[in-house]
Curated annotation (Swiss-Prot):
GO terms for cellular component: cytosolic large ribosomal subunit. It comes from Corynebacterium diphtheriae (strain ATCC 700971 / NCTC 13129 / Biotype gravis). Part of the 50S ribosomal subunit. It comes from the Bacteria. Belongs to the universal ribosomal protein uL30 family. InterPro entries: Ribo_uL30_ferredoxin-like_sf (IPR036919), Ribosomal_uL30_bac-type (IPR005996), Ribosomal_uL30_ferredoxin-like (IPR016082). The keyword Membrane does not apply. GO terms for biological process: translation. GO terms for molecular function: structural constituent of ribosome. This is Large ribosomal subunit protein uL30. The keyword Ribosomal protein applies. Keywords: Ribonucleoprotein, Ribosomal protein.
Amino acid sequence: MALKITQHKGLVGANPKQRKNMAALGLKHINHSVVHQDTPVVRGMVNVVRHMVSVEEVAGE
């Protein structure tokens, strides 16, 4: 199972922890999407920025 993560809000006003998590996820700008494996590490990073992103489960690796 994989997760499609899409950034919906910008980083203006975000704290440094949120900025680092967005960079670690590979998200650079609004409406940018990335696909990551569904792991506890990725889920934790998404949880930190949950108000800035949307998450969908997609099939595949």
